[in-house]
């Protein structure tokens, strides 16, 4: 996810379809590519309106689409058009969902919009590592006091989500981001579902071994 960015573009990160540095998206100027995932690209950018660095996530399912005209995307095969549009709707839905909430341990969406046959999400530029990465660097189990501090922030974020009738459904060490400065941030609402709108509809199973709730295995 885009939130896992550092303060500078990651060395060695590149992609043939990435927007080059200097590209303008509205008031934002792309400075470099931070990361590439299966469904999106994350850029470091500069907001010329508010004069601050931000992270921009672009909907880019690399298996389905590529860059065709300047900043625009094109679906590689007509048979993938429906899947591409469904993913785009999901991306925009996630942005709208995140924009509803305001909590220091939830990703804040400053702005999102659709253009160029894709969509963009503007967020803070976080610096740090995931809980999973931090644990891998530890030679011994982390102290209980440290764990409690991390979990307290995560539980606070979940409380806000649950009050908003929203389920995260993908809590795991790689979705908890430990900032260099600031509280832990809960990542990846791509698996989230709005509880009210989903009543009577089938959830898409999102399972993570050792972390998925047991009731998901029967869905």
Outline where the language-model segments fall:
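AlphaC helix of the eukaryotic protein kinase fold
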Residues: 68-100
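Activation-segment/catalytic-loop signature of the eukaryotic protein kinase fold
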Residues: 112
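AlphaC helix of the protein kinase catalytic domain
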Residues: 131-142
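Activation segment signature within eukaryotic-like protein kinase domains
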Residues: 150-151
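Protein kinase catalytic-loop region centered on the HRD/HxD motif
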Residues: 156-166
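Conserved activation segment of eukaryotic-like protein kinases, specifically the C-terminal portion
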Residues: 202-216
């Amino acid at each position: 996810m885009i939130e896992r960015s550092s303060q500078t573009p990651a060395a060695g990160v590149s992609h043939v379809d990435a927007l080059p540095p200097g590209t303008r998206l509205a008031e934002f100027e792309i400075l470099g590519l931070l990361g590439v995932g299966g469904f999106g690209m994350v850029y470091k950018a500069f907001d010329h309106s508010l004069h601050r660095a931000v992270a921009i996530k672009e909907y880019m399912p690399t298996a389905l689409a590529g860059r065709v005209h300047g900043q625009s995307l094109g679906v590689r095969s007509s048979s993938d058009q429906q899947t591409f549009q469904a993913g785009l709707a999901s991306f925009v839905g996630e942005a709208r969902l995140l924009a509803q909430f305001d909590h220091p341990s939830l990703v804040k969406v400053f702005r999102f919009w659709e253009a160029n046959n894709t969509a963009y999400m503007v967020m803070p530029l976080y610096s740090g590592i995931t809980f999973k990465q931090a644990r891998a660097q530890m030679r011994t189990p982390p102290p209980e006091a440290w764990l409690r501090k991390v979990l307290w922030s995560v539980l606070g974020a979940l409380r806000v989500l649950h009050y908003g009738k929203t389920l995260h459904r993908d809590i795991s060490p790689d979705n908890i981001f430990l900032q260099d400065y600031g509280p832990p941030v809960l990542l990846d609402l791509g698996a989230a579902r709005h509880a009210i709108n989903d009543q009577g509809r089938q959830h898409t199973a999102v399972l993570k071994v050792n972390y998925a709730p047991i009731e998901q295995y029967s869905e």
